[in-house]
């Protein structure tokens, strides 16, 4: 097999360098910011912090597409309900796994909010705040992504789609 790698930067790969502008530094992973609408907590926080001076460009109805060698293509819609329907259309026999995946995402997201809240508490409160706020998240954080995804479905293509965007997070799902 041959693989073509298209890379314009002098250092190939992601997470290999940072940008610096006007005293600020960030890694290349921040090329898109999601959930910045007025209907989401991150969007409301950023709107408040910037006093409404930032205008966010939409990533579009589908912010990503994946193409497979056998002509299978899947789009990643911006809205979770549309993504669920996209997955159900592509994998009609996997409704249980798809619903379990979305339920898991909701639960992990909710537990991470509590986890981060526990991280901003004074250190002397950690024994209490960790047990009250961080416990569920810690359970998720101690699991390998690949193990969790494999527990949802044996369909390898669906497993790949569930973890397709691992590159955004800088670590392999295993």
Which residues make up each language-model segment?
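Rossmann-like flavin
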Residues: 69-174
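N-terminal glycine-rich phosphate/pyrophosphate-binding loop and immediately adjacent elements
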Residues: 1-110
